[in-house]
């Protein structure tokens, strides 16, 4: 079915649907619809989940208000999807500590700022982040930042075929190696868990990582626990034989049993030849246990969480499925192409 069927044009010519298709990229149209908060100054309790579709907006608002507000700002992020706020999301149970604390916290907040009752909330540190893996809360005075460490992609050139071919190292390899994989729009890499699919959360994804249209880069087993908190960025030196292509980046914990559970991901559509491709992943707070490893998985699709890129460069809503192209992508690492992950490491 076409994105602009004649019947919608005839029966709903003034529908916002047409505006959405016309403004399929960030523009002034969307800026005008965004809430104007520059004159807002109120105490706020910001609530989010690591697998919440809207987490980026929650964190952005908290950072904005915390930087200029004269009123207290508090942020709490648990191992949750958008709703409900419970101890289990996806395939994992995060324990009793993850059980919903929000209702009680809201009452304390309202009692303090609406009734003037001293509930002790102003004596607490303003940021509460649930550390997955350790399954307990961590407190911060400000959003973790400036704590990034680079881990570089390295490969034998067979990262699409062998799970031991792509690795993650603390130093960039001297020589450049290319990994090549092929995106088929008729059998796209499926979405599984994360923050953009339903059901959300951490899922066992080793079967997906075995596909030949997925590149995997895995660290060595850790000799000590690794603690992450904050924003994660992936920079990939990637080219393709199409006008446009997508990249999906997923970070997972690889347990010593061989099972693989995702904990954050990001997605980007590339319409230019700019290198490296920068992918901002969902923020996270995660402990990867000693003896386990962590992995980056790269693919050119994550369907149906994101629509398949036809590779034609046609505007969203105008591309036809029949015109979708098979796309060959090349990821380069090492030498002059330092593909890397910027991890937010905390003590």
Outline where the language-model segments fall.
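Glycine/threonine-rich phosphate-binding loop and adjacent beta-strand/alpha-helix elements that clamp
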Residues: 92, 102, 114-347
């Amino acid at each position: 079915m076409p994105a602009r069927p004649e019947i919608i044009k005839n029966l709903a010519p003034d529908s916002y649907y047409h505006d959405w298709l016309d403004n399929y990229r960030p523009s002034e149209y969307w800026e005008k619809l965004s809430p104007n908060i520059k004159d807002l100054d109120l105490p706020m309790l910001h609530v989010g989940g690591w697998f919440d579709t809207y987490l980026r907006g929650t964190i952005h608002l908290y950072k904005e208000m915390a930087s200029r507000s004269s009123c207290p700002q508090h942020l709490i992020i648990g191992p949750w999807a958008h709703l409900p706020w419970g101890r289990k999301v996806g395939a994992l149970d995060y324990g009793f500590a993850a059980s919903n604390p929000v209702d009680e916290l809201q009452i304390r907040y309202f009692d303090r700022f609406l009734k003037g009752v001293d509930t002790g909330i102003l004596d607490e540190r303003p940021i509460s982040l649930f550390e997955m893996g350790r399954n307990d809360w961590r407190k911060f005075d400000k959003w973790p930042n400036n704590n990034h460490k680079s881990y570089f992609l390295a490969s034998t050139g067979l990262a699409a075929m062998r799970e031991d071919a792509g690795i993650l190292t603390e130093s960039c390899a001297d020589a450049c190696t290319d990994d090549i994989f092929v995106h088929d729009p008729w059998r796209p890499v499926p979405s599984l868990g994360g923050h953009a699919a339903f059901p959300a959360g951490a899922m066992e994804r080793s079967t997906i990582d075995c596909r030949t249209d997925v590149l995997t880069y895995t660290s060595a087993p850790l000799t000590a626990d690794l603690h992450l908190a904050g924003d994660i960025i992936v920079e990939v030196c990637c080219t393709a034989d199409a006008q446009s292509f997508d990249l999906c980046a997923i970070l997972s914990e690889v347990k010593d049993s061989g099972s693989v559970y995702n904990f954050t991901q990001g997605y980007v559509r590339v319409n230019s030849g700019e290198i490296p491709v920068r992918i901002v992943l969902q923020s996270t707070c995660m402990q990867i246990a000693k003896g386990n490893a962590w992995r980056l998985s790269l693919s050119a699709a994550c369907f149906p969480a994101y629509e398949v890129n036809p590779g034609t460069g046609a505007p969203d809503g105008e591309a036809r499925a029949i015109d979708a192209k098979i796309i060959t992508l090349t990821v380069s690492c090492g030498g002059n192409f330092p593909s890397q992950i910027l991890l937010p490491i905390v003590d």
